[in-house]
């Protein structure tokens, strides 16, 4: 164990055996024990924050509503690497030559392709998962940065559409808030096949306003099927792209979004199916 009894007193002589269970903390009659995490300890399958959360759940019989995603450090702007030019084209002298970051996406079929000043798109996060204020802030930020933001699968807030210079209307498996008018309001339509993270049910977050935007009952569990029920193969994806293109009168690009998996095969299918943009 962690402790050994010496002359009737417990001493933590084997601290390397501690798994963060916190039983000693609960059993100590004098509340004299404090359990602290070891930041450099990488041996545990369940980290210290995980154990603390498990204990909290056991005590409260409920889970904490919080953001989800990987706990590891994610890349930021300092991690962006621009592929250097060497022989194929002369390097740019940054002191004398301008460097453009503007890009045009989806000009093969769409009458109004996406034109971005900054080629870093804001990921899809829906209203309900984010507050109205957060969605409005992303819309304002995307406009200031000259890029595009995304409705996510929770429908489109009128304020979001008003504040975002460019806004992608997501078409996900749950089809929350989806209509022809919704699709036509977007500067692009994104068919979400997969994504990097997925939270749980979240029915307690379906307020009256979320209900109105998503067009589902208040307090209901907003469940999204694991896949689009009408997209089961390559031909179905091609038909869906064509359908959305017709609904939007060929005016905006059609995007297909995948999670990381069999990337080469999936991208090939989406490109053959007529996708304007693949993310």
Describe the function of each predicted region.
Residues 12-15, 128-129, 231, 257:
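Residue-level marker of alpha-helix boundaries and capping positions
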Residues 31-32, 36-120, 124-164, 169, ...:
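Conserved, well-structured core domains of diverse proteins
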Residues 16-17, 27:
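Short pre-active-site segment immediately N-terminal to redox-active cysteine/selenocysteine motifs
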Residues 140, 144, 155-156, 161-163, ...:
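Alpha/beta enzyme core
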Residues 1-11, 23-41:
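Iron-sulfur cluster-binding cysteine motifs and their immediate structural context
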Residues 8, 125-127, 259:
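Short strand-loop junctions, especially beta-strand C-caps/beta-turns
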């Amino acid at each position: 164990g962690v402790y050994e009894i010496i002359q009737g007193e417990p001493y933590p002589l084997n601290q390397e055996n501690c798994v963060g269970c916190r039983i000693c903390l609960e059993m100590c009659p004098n509340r004299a024990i404090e359990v602290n995490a070891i930041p450099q300890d990488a041996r545990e399958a369940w980290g210290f924050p995980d154990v603390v959360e498990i204990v909290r759940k056991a005590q409260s019989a409920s889970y904490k509503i919080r953001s989800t995603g990987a706990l590891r450090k994610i890349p930021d702007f300092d991690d962006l690497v621009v592929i250097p030019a060497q022989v194929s084209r002369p390097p740019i002298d940054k002191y004398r030559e301008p460097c453009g970051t503007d890009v045009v996406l989806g000009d093969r079929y769409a009458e109004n392709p996406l034109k971005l000043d900054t080629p870093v798109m804001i990921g899809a996060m829906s209203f309900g998962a984010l507050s109205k204020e957060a969605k409005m802030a992303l819309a304002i930020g995307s406009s200031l940065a000259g890029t595009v933001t995304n409705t996510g699968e929770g429908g489109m807030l009128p304020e979001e559409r008003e504040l975002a210079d460019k806004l992608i209307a997501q078409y996900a498996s749950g089809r929350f808030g989806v209509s022809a008018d919704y699709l036509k309001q977007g500067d692009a339509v994104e068919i979400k096949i997969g994504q990097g993270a997925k939270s749980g049910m979240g029915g307690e977050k379906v307020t009256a306003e979320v209900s109105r935007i998503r067009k589902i009952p208040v307090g209901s569990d907003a469940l999204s099927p694991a896949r689009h029920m009408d997209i089961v193969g390559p031909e179905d994806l091609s038909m869906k792209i064509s359908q959305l293109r017709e609904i939007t009168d060929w005016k905006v690009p059609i995007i297909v979004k995948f999670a990381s998996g069999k990337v080469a095969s999936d991208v090939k299918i989406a490109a053959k199916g007529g996708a304007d943009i693949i993310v």
